[in-house]
Amino acid sequence: GVYDQLTEWYKKGDLDFSKIHTVNLDEYKGIDAENKQSYHYFMNQHLFSRVNIELQNTFVPDGMNENQDEECQRYEKLIAGLGGVDLQLLGLGHNGHIGFNEPAEVFVKQTHCVSLSEKTIQANQRFFESKEQVPKQAYTMGIGTIRSARKILINY
């Protein structure tokens, strides 16, 4: 996958992560960063622990923040404070969703809390012991925030 390739380039000396800041696309609401199903945990396991990135420069929405407006505003301010996103790595979901932004006629522009569709819950069930354990909501960057990145790379 893409994180394996980035790690390989780092090991060869082709990439240096020491000055990189990362802002993750999304995180499940109600899941702690130490939970093995969180995106925070996933990134630590698959990239951050394998390269020379400073952990204080890695940012993921706080899935445990119950105050949705506060968390979304905090994340948008964080991104703005970093000068925006230089490179946005994206994957496409089973139905074309980007982050947890489901296909729609109108998109939310900024980071927001979204209720996951039944199809997305079913698709993500494979990562959990049961369907009931799949979170029903997530924080996700909005399409406007994603599109404001200077470059976008879609991994499929």
Which residues does each PLM region occupy?
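A glycine-rich beta-strand to alpha-helix segment
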Residues: 1-2, 77-103
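Ligand-binding beta-strand-loop-alpha-helix segment within the catalytic cores
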Residues: 15-87
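Short, structured patches in soluble enzyme cores that scaffold and shape functional sites
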Residues: 26, 62, 91-92, 102, ...
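Glycine-rich N-terminal segment of FAD-binding domains in flavoprotein oxidoreductases
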Residues: 1-12
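Channel- or pocket-lining gating/hinge segments that regulate access to a cavity or pore
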Residues: 149-156
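Class I SAM-dependent methyltransferase SAM-binding "motif I" and its flanking Rossmann-like core
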Residues: 99-143
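Generic hydrophobic alpha-helical segments
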Residues: 6, 71, 75-79, 142, ...
